[in-house]
Amino acid sequence: MNEYIKTLINVNKDANKNISALESTIQNITVTTEKDKVNFGNLCIALKGFRMVSEATECLLVNENVLKTEDNEFYVKVNTEGKSDNTQEHEL
């Protein structure tokens, strides 16, 4: 596996960790002051940004025939004979 794919996988994993942390923070935030409103808005912007990074890296990985499972594991889709119905998956 080349460094480009490794980097994309690591960026995706980091983005997903940040998404979880931000979602937890946003759920537990109390907005009472103007500063709280600004901070809440900025947290929402950050969350949207990390979601975009996650989605973009997944799209880049799919373009490299790297697929992600529901368990957040990555696999390389290998076409063994040049036919779309004859494929194998290899865990990364």
Task: Label each PLM-derived region with a short phrase.
Residues 7-9, 21, 25, 75:
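Ordered hydrophobic segments in well-structured contexts
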